Amino acid sequence: MPKRGETAARILAAAREIVRATGPDSLTFDAVAAKVGVSKQAVLYWYPNKARLIEALVRPALEAESAAGQGAISDKASPPRAIRAFVSALAVFHSSDLDRFRLMYVTPQIGQRPGRNGQMLTTLGRIHPATTEMYDKLAATLVEGGRYDRLVEARRAAAAIHTALLGLILRMAMADALNAPLRARNDGLVEALVDVMAPEAA
């Protein structure tokens, strides 16, 4: 008999494999149960709704992303250097595993919409702190370096910087999925984005 918690780990592994192999639309409790070899009720015991299952899949990746972003920002870094390091580190993090990126930023959008029965809204509330910590560190550096006077403005900028990068990674992920490479190299696009956000001094 599996140890307590082992079934939950097998469920997550199966769900992750389903998403990677056939896409988020295929992630159903029936599909997960069949892959693990347990009943649908056994899956529901550990993850009572799809929002909880998606949260369990996504949250560790978001926390790893946050750690990568925060770790790239060195103490006393100037705002341009901090931005360049932040964007470059997250670009490497995501482009090295586009399936993980899809799991993080595409899967939660599939199926149940935020706020329906309050389930997905609660899930997003649990996930939010990991990304907030990342924004806070970049924002503090931007304020300390004089880029912004107010922390609220710096946080808004941190969110915009991150979102712009995610948009670029989404283009890369789409090109990868369609086997239709973009005209420009991926690293060249990241460099161009970084140069727009934080131009290097002449």
What is each model feature region?
Residues 10, 14, 18-52, 56:
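Helix-turn-helix
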